[in-house]
Amino acid sequence: MKWLVVKIVNPRNGETLVDPCCGIADFLSLSFVNAVEKQKDWQLDDANIYGVDLDESMIMLATLNMLLNGDGEAKLYCKHTPGSILTKIAVGDTPTLVDLIPDRHKGGNWHDWPDNTKLMQFDVVLTNPPFGEDRAYRPSTEQDRRIIEMYETWSLAGNGDNIDLGVVFLENAYHVLKPEGRLGIVLSNSIASINRWQKVREWLMERMRIVALFDLPPNVFAETGVNTTLIVAYKPKSSAALKKLIEQEYSVFVRDIERIGYERRTSKRNVFFNPVYRIDETTFEVMTDKDGHPILEEDFTQTIADFRQWALGQEETLQCLFLRET
């Protein structure tokens, strides 16, 4: 699934990339590998790759993951709870971590600083934040509340008690993207569908050009069992540019992903992931590619091809952002 996100959003040479909930940095490492595979001189500059996580052990594993994939310069930061909800990356000769100031940065106004601090904005945000009712942000202290009040979506959709962390990181992604920056974010399907988050969806559509929605089966994230949606979008250069797209009733690529190439099995409380291969309907044998390797029964490859074909018929900005190879 993470390959799908990387192939669709298409990070490339010269761009900055961040995952504010990086875990073991799969999105970051796959983006680096994907760029290297295209051509040698096209690869991402590993010094332009950033990740933040609140778990120190995750950052250690992320560092190892990046090193094993040939990236030894990615900037990976551990910042304990509340992590990148409060802490951002500031511009500088050496980028540094800075904390938002609750009294100055309420409601998403994050650019008002008492000094010359300037937050970094990125070309690409790829992330799979924590989400769901059991992972909601629940302010238990006055400081917790002051922190979450720096997010506009808290006043829109927070019920005074909690807000889905997926919503918080959706807003975070918007703020840290450059104009014409691209987003790939995996959220609970409920954020894209139920009434409670209607105002969040409206907030997003008033600020970003939704490019694609991919509904994913629950076993993609076996540890949660939650149905998820991948949202792909870009941030137009101006509100006027977005308004024009809305007036033109822009198109959104929508796809249900059903076949993922493996099945989950449980035996004696142990979870196993068994590959599922494509079967020839005539011979009932496992199909193989030109190199003799078995072909997985998955929808990702065709979905990527279909998306790229669809994108050829969209506005020039979208084509440039998602299809350009250099």
Give short role names for the model-derived ranges.
Residues 102-326:
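A conserved structural/catalytic subdomain of Rossmann-like adenosyl-cofactor enzymes
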